[in-house]
């Protein structure tokens, strides 16, 4: 078949064979074209037209293309879809090519190996992760090529759930797995990481990985990195380096200078349910940043600071010593408005140094990147000057470790023009007077253009053609253009170059000679300018370790100044962090909701947890009254305190927690085939297996997804287990509709009852959103149903049924354990008959109905209810 291919298509085939997993963007003139199966997939993902090459042939080749000047937007779309792209360029001038233009793949873009600023989200990391498993456990490593951040960990048996939690926290853009484990790992994690890339087992070999890591860090042992005795962590870390070197040939990774191995260190574990339920960095409903805790706290001014704050929110500390250091820095800047303001003003002049330096080291930076580096370095002395007067250890230490780097800023300013193009290959980069050879070539180029203008005047005079012009383009070079009306006056020695509709183009020997001289000088200018720029870029690359250290310090300064500002804006208090189990909050508020400017303002609430008498609070009250908000705000206040932030409260005393667990909300996990109740029980089981006396547990409506007595029994047993100091004894907030659970306070000394205050005025109910001591014996569900718009006939019937049920349940016995048991009166035949529609709903088998059938049935029932109401 290859013998039937044109030379161009043979060239395409050869290049495609080298990059079978990537979509090949093949440069043809002003377009990147895709062929065959790449064209079919590319057209579908990019939503562009699919056409064909050689339309007159029976076996047409599918074709689609995108313009080269707009390629970035198309790359972003494909990378978000989890695809990789091999970018193939024409690497020689088509005018000088003898035969087919030579083409090469100059860059392979994969979701996890991006370094270009226009392909990255500024405030978020872009991790490439690798994962491998063995009978004894699993290893995970992750690398942000755009910043040089490199981490690894190892887990023992039973790693699947913990690995899910970690991957959700890391959010890698691409996951590298061994080929023979790809099916298993894709099944487990593709819902978390859409781009799962299978790689050869050889790159996961621990011996090869060790050698590669020793070479990368120029050391004789990996003991200092903490992975020497962790073969799976080591294997995955080595696999990442191998993959980057394979996909980015010639790339120098000199900005990757450290591997951090995670163990059982002072970082709070946050499982995926807690990350989702507390909406730490994304809203649970739509995945957006707005409405998350991160969005409420983020006042950072640099991309580096935004990424660090995100890391702090997702990795609260359990050791209060470093937390108190952060907190003291926030307190100092909170109290000193002037210094905080000046630091923030100076930080505005700092670019993303981490990613700038990565592009410089990887030889992907342009001249504008170097100028941005220069401007950032020039802002550093003022920042350091403001730090000099700081007394908190967190800020003082950064002042003492400061690097100046003024000499690099001077070198860049002395070399580069103040206004440079985006391309580094087209000239216009280097200042006049910097290089004598370049200055000489520029004189030739400028004089040459004057000579061409003189030839234009000369030829007009000789021919008498006033409209004669000498022009230039990249295909034909310099040429004389004469309109059709003047062709009879063209001299015989003019050589025709091109015929247009209204004009013809010519050249002369004199013009050709001058063109060679001028264009030769311009080509040498471009070459020399790039060489001088590249030399400057290499000099800048040698400063990478110092700039990276500065970037980390600047990010930390940015975060604490931002936290000080948000504390000042919202009247936060400095929490008292302790090592005991107290959790006392006075006038606590929800950090996200209070910024939403709620009608009537946000109602603050108190929390008293801890000690032998307040281990578990049973919180009852109606829906929509604020129970869930109260639970979430308590967890968020604790988390904020353990990242070093001030908190939304009047007073807060917080005994540091080792974990925060949340069981909030109800939703089916359709991807894993789990019902609402199964999800609820799985999350509850995770809490009971892993919570300790130092944990904070937030439970909202345990047991809703099953029958009343089953649900009550489970909720009762779970509450007892959590409250019992001999079993778990975790500090727990337990919101429930099961009012029977308030009886736990009579039989368990560590349980206390609280409820959401309600004011009744006739049939009107006012939710006060205030948590007060004592249990509630009413849920006000019918009132909520009325607010939701249920038909009047249904509301009336519900009130009738409720009255009869309450009458039948009035006499109750209590068993020896304090559990309330209903008398037979509650189950006798005096109960009212159910509504016919309820009978119909019970008999419906939803699993045998299509979504359309279910919607039609629901519509029919609604219409019947409306007819009853109107009747």
Q: Model segments located where?
A:
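ATPase nucleotide-binding head domains, primarily ABC-like/P-loop NTPase cores
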Residues: 36-37, 230, 301, 306-312, ...
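Conserved phosphate-binding elements of NTP-dependent enzyme cores
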Residues: 2, 10-14, 21, 537, ...
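Amphipathic heptad-repeat alpha-helical coiled-coil/stalk segments that mediate oligomerization
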Residues: 201-212, 216-219, 268-274, 280, ...
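Charged catalytic and DNA/RNA-contacting regions of genome-maintenance
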Residues: 1-332, 341, 345-361, 365-457, ...
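Conserved catalytic alpha/beta cores of large enzymes that bind or transform nucleotide phosphates
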Residues: 167, 172-178, 186, 510-543, ...
